[in-house]
């Protein structure tokens, strides 16, 4: 009876050593033979993406002349053709968020902040 235990232990140790001695050929390693180009992510800024952004920018001088000429925020929204888009997006948070990411809406909000700062004084 004890001889059967010896055979079981011998068979188990044989199986364990057979698993440890087998090599895995499915592993692929990086080839480090020579220099290679690394593909890194590059994050572009708005200035890099848009070459003519300065020409379209709403700077303080333009806002000052618009304000002195009597341009209201609603009038500027109409000039940018945003009134219908704002009215359509008023009931949807997703639509308003998407509209807020546009260049025209950012210009309108910049002018709105300028007018709010200068009328409060």
Curated annotation (Swiss-Prot):
CC annotations in GO: extracellular region; host cell cytoplasm; host cell nucleus
Transmembrane segments: none
Motif (RxLR-dEER): 38-56
Annotated stretches, region: WY domain: 57-121
Keywords linked to the UniProt accession: Host cytoplasm, Host nucleus, Secreted, Signal
Signal peptide: 1-18
Places the protein is found: Secreted; Host cytoplasm; Host nucleus
Pfam families: WYL_3 (PF18488)
Main location: secreted
Family: Belongs to the RxLR effector family.
Domain-level remarks: The RxLR-dEER motif acts to carry the protein into the host cell cytoplasm through binding to cell surface phosphatidylinositol-3-phosphate. The WY domain contains 3 alpha-helices and is required for the interaction with a host MAP kinase.
Function: Secreted effector involved in P.mirabilis colonization of host plants. May perturb the signaling of cell death associated with plant immunity, via interaction with a host MAP kinase.
Protein name per the record: RxLR effector protein PexRD2
Native organism taxonomy: Eukaryota, Sar, Stramenopiles, Oomycota, Peronosporales
Gene designation: PexRD2
């Amino acid at each position: 009876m004890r001889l059967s235990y010896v055979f079981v232990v011998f068979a188990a140790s044989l199986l364990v050593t057979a698993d440890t001695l087998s090599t895995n050929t499915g592993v692929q390693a990086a080839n480090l033979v020579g220099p290679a180009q690394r593909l890194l992510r590059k994050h572009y800024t708005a200035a890099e993406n848009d070459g003519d952004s300065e020409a379209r920018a709403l700077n303080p001088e333009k806002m000052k002349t618009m304000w002195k000429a009597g341009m209201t925020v609603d009038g500027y929204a109409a000039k940018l053709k945003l009134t219908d888009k704002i009215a359509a997006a008023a009931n949807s948070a997703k639509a308003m968020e998407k509209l807020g990411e546009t260049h025209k809406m950012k210009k309108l909000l910049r002018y709105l902040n300028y007018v709010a700062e200068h009328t409060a004084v």
